[in-house]
Amino acid sequence: VEVDGRPVREEKKVYILLNKPAGYISTVDDPRGRKTVLDLVADVKERVYPVGRLDYDTSGLLILTNDGDLTYKLTHPSFEVKKTYLVEVEGNPGKELERLEQGVLLSDGMTAPALVSRVKAGKESTSFQLTIHEGRNRQVRRMCEAIGHPVKSLKRIKFAFLELADLPEGKYRYLTEKEIKNLQGLA
C-alpha cells in the first residue's frame, strides 16, 4: 500500500487487557479534560481504542486494541459476548435478584436475562456477580436501580473468558497469542 508514492506499512495489531480504575473515562480523549484510559497506556506506541465502555465510576477489565474487526465482533449485540461484573448494591435485594435473571424493563426496553451468582448479603449492602451479554449504556446500574437497589460499587471482572486475575488496578498486560486467537474465534 502506498500513499503519495511512499510505502505505508500496516500498523501492528495490539491487544491489551487493562484493569481500569474508577475515575477514568473510556474514550480516546475528553473535551472536558478528564483522565482517559489512554493515560494509563501512554507508553504503548500504537494508537489503541477501548473495546466498549466502562462508566467513569466503574472499574475493571477493559480491552484496548487497534483491531477494528475484532472490536466490532466483541461489541455487536448479535455475538452475545458475556461480561461478568462484581456488583455491590445498597440493601438486601433477596428475591428481587430473580428479576435480574428474568430480564428487567428499562427505558430502552427489556434486558436479556442475566446470570446472578455468588451472592453475599450483609446488613447494609449485598454483593454478587452479574453476567450479561448486552452492552447498553449504564446497563448494570440501571438494572439494579430498577429492582430498587442502587449500585454502590461496580467492577467488571470478566470479559468472555478473559479475567483480571491478579493484575493491579491501573496496570495492563498484552494478551497472549492464544487469548487473541480465542477472542477471534468467538464470532
Question: In which residue ranges do the predicted regions lie?
Answer:
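Basic, flexible Lys/Arg- and Gly-enriched helix-loop patches that mediate nucleic-acid binding at interfaces
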Residues: 1-187
